């Protein structure tokens, strides 16, 4: 790797929020090149690993272990600076040789600091051949003070012969951004101002519990990861406490203040009041049994923490608690990425680096492109399973990143209450309760008309429209939404059946099938059908191939279709291989411009060396991107085998053949899976609109 493919993040002080900047750089770099690494030249000597490095390693694509991504400790640097820098350079080059680009995150002033620490970082950057991205803290400073800090830092870096590529003034009050921006215009390097975001330094309920030396005595375990956005020491009467409550607040009160406990618990459960993060009972007092029983009867999921500390000590500890952005802090990570996207020209900054043109497509590159493509033309997607926490968390992320517009089905009060408890902002979503919607009876009448040949009456149709999946499908059918994603808590049949009954298939296609987008370390392949049709006929197999090629093209995959069998070319005989041969000819007749080969074995389809001996002149063999399996048994087992043995990321199943997109989730789907599936559905909907 050329040294100019690295960028060095340096700061003159602690608490500048460099991890936010580093996340944004890594996120964009992993979408540009295959192997992105991160390096920490100086770390503390500690039994615990550097949490910032662990956070950033989770967002790299070079696959290097922690031990290879660190240089020296502060102790080594203080003992012999020249030797330490030489060791840093050696360690850096050893890891950088395996990367296309590296983000180097300088020291954090977390050990015995020195007035020359920035100079040391500048000297290291010069020795690594990396331009510097200077990060300063704007919080609690006037615009002139921020400019003065930047001026001193630029001079110091220039003394070390370091090249400063850009300046970021981080953690700036929103109202001060225009003035700080103006104050930095006089400097040569481009400057960016990023606002302060309280969420990034907010402790979680679990971190607050540790800070007050407490223990969680009741409440939903999942809510211990919610961020605490404020602290109230409730020493006043209950009515004044209620006036001061805000979303995400932790309320501290002695355990014997039954009036306050009841008021706060009731407020949390009541519609129109803020959703709290937790209650902290201090003083070592236990709730009176009658009060405890009453609170329990409210069926709150709100975490309740008990501590033996007094009110002052509890409030002081809680107010000074600071949260970390760790590898599991997904909401904070999403917020950091949004801040960088909105306030820093990351693409322009990285354009200063010499980054190799990629010849492969990694999973990170592909998923980034998916989200960008979905974001380019916002579609409205309906999520029928509004009572599932995974759906709500996914919805929050999708809305925060501006990937789609959303309609969520469910009891609006319950959906929004649970979202608030999870720390999820659904302000940008429309929430509809099917049975209470003004569209309910209209949809029932329409459905009864569509299905009258099947004996469906209006009364029966009204019952069916109470089902969120059917109601969501009708929203798509009537253009109130562009697509639907379901299945987190329902079977595939429950998701697909309404679509077949209502939306129906594309003209010329009689089969609804699926593909998985298989993100291998160096490329993305489409596998079909691995989820829907057990034993396809010749005509169905041809439908699957044609639909899969169209779907692959929608996601930037040039379709070259391999019709898979146990033999290649004319070498095999029998009913199974004859079916594949006939389906291949049918595809050629229906889509003469589509490159297709079959029957062909898997290795001959994807390995050029095998193809050279078996099908030398084929435009598909050895280069296939769309692989069509002869039956569901083969397809399903193959995709799972490749997923497990090759470490591939399987995105799907992506349903195809419908007039409008409806996609199914695995009941074990993770939040990332749901986000990707919604993005895919949005891209399919964009194709329908074209």
UniProtKB/Swiss-Prot annotation:
InterPro entries: DRTGG, P-Actrans_bac, P-loop_NTPase, P_AcTrfase, P_AcTrfase_dom1, P_AcTrfase_dom2, Phos_Acetyltrans/Butyryltrans, PTA_PTB
Main location: cytoplasm
Protein EC: 2.3.1.8
Domain of life: Bacteria
Subcellular location: Cytoplasm
Keyword Transferase attributed: yes
GO biological process: acetyl-CoA biosynthetic process
Catalytic activity line of the entry: acetyl-CoA + phosphate = acetyl phosphate + CoA
The protein's role, per its UniProt record: Involved in acetate metabolism.
Comment field on protein domains: The N-terminal region seems to be important for proper quaternary structure. The C-terminal region contains the substrate-binding site.
Family in the record: In the N-terminal section; belongs to the CobB/CobQ family. In the C-terminal section; belongs to the phosphate acetyltransferase and butyryltransferase family.
UniProt-recorded name of the protein: Phosphate acetyltransferase
The species this protein was found in: Mycobacterium tuberculosis (strain ATCC 25618 / H37Rv)
